[in-house]
Amino acid sequence: MAGAYREETRPKAIAQGTKIPIPVAENQAMGDSRSMNPTIPQGMLEPARHVPVARETDVLVCGGGPAGIAAAFTAARAGARVLILERHPFLGGVWTAGALTILIDTEHKDGLNREIRRRLEKRGAATYCGLWPDWPVYGLEAMKALLDEMVEETGVEVQYYTTVAAVAREGRRISGVFTESKSGREFVRAKVIIDATGDGDVAAQAGCEFKLGRPGDGKTQPMTLYGRIGGYTGGPVHVQPLLDIAINAGVQPSYGDVTLFPQPGQPGVFLLMATHLYGNALDVRDLTRAEMQGRAEIRKLVDLYRRHAGPDWKNVYLIDTGPFLGVRESRRILGRHYLTVEELKAGKTFEDGICHVRFIADIHHPDPSEGSGLTHVFFPAYDIPYRCLIARDVDNLMMAGRCISGDHIAFASYRVTGDAIAMGEAAALCVKHGIDPDDVHRPELLAELAKMRTTEWTSPAC
C-alpha cells in the first residue's frame, strides 16, 4: 500500500517580517487555478501599525479543541500560566462546534480521557449505544459546561472570539502571536506556543513546512456537517430503513450512510450524520459552499423522514445544524519525526512514545467520483513519538491534534479525539522544566506523563 504513494511537500509559508515583492499575484503564488481579473491589483501592502502587547504567558495554546484543552489543563496543573485563544465562544472544538457528540478511541486511555468520560457519566450526560458500544455519546451543552468548570478549577485563562492573525518569529523561535478580535489587533507574548488549531495555522504562519492531502493530487478527506433533530416518538432506531427511504427517493446521502446518535437525557433527540462535503478546509470559498450544501442536504433528509418514515417520525423536525463544519483533514506540519504507514503496519513502538493508538485508519474518500463512504485499514497498535509534536523549523513551537507530523494514511488513524487529548497532555509537560520541547529528557518526560495519567485529579466538581 505504501509503495503506491509519493509524498509531496507543500511550499513554505511566508514568515512574519519576510520582505516580498509588491505587487504579488497572491492567488498564483498559492497555486490557485482560479482566473484573475487583470483590472484588480494583484496585492496590497498592509499599512504598518503599532500593536499593543495585551498579555504575557508561559504557555500559549492556540485552539481550544480536545488537544488544546488537554494541553492547557495539563500545563496549568503543572504550575504554568496558561492562556487559550479560541475563535468560538466555547471550548471543545469538534466536540462542540463540530457537534461530534461521541468520544472516539478513549476507552483504553487514562488521564484526561478517563477524567472527562467519568465526569460526563457522573452527571448523566454520557450514554452508550449499540453502534459503538465502547464510545460514549455525550450531550453538547453538558460538554460545554464541563469544560467551563475545568477552566475554573485549573486557573486556565481563556479568550474567546479570537483568531491568530500572524506570528512574530525571530530566527528559530516565536516570541508571540498577533491576534484579531473585537478588541482589534493585539500581541500575546509567550515562552512556549502549542498549535492546537487543527489546521496547523500557527505553524504555517511561522513558515513551517507542511503537507496537505494525499500524495499526487493533494485532495483531503471530506468535511461533515451534523444536524440535530427532535420529535421522534418511537423506540430504538434502525438506520437501514432510513437509508433505504433516502435512496428510493433519489436522495442518496453524500456520506453514503445515515448514522444517528441519541442525545443523553433528551428523548427523541438525535445527532444526524449523513453528509460528505468536499473541498479544501483552508479555502474560505470551499468552506462557505460546504456549509450551505450541508444544511440543504440535512433539511431534505429530515423532511423526507417526516413524510415517509412512519408514524414515529411524523413530528420530526430539525432543531439546528452544527455551529461549524467538522473538518477531518488539512495541514500536517513537519516535525522532528514523520510517522509513516509503514511504521503503523509494523505496530511500531518508540522510546519517546507518548500515546498508544488502537484506532483504524479511517479514510473517507477525498473525491466523490470514487464513491461515497470510506475505507478502513486495520493496523496493530502503535505509538506516536513525542518528536512528531515538535515543529521541525521552530524550536519553541509544538503541535497537538491532527496537525502533527505524519503521512496521509497514518494521519487517518491518529486524527481522532482520544489521541488528540493524549497529544495535548504530552505537549504540555515540557513547560514544567522551562526549556524548549526538544531539550526535554525523554525518560523523565515519559515517567511524568505516566504518573499524571494514573493520578486522580481532585476538584470540588469531581
Predicted regions and their residues:
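Flavin (FAD/FMN)-binding glycine-rich loop and adjacent Rossmann-like elements that form
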Residues: N37-P41, L45-H50, V94, Y161, ...
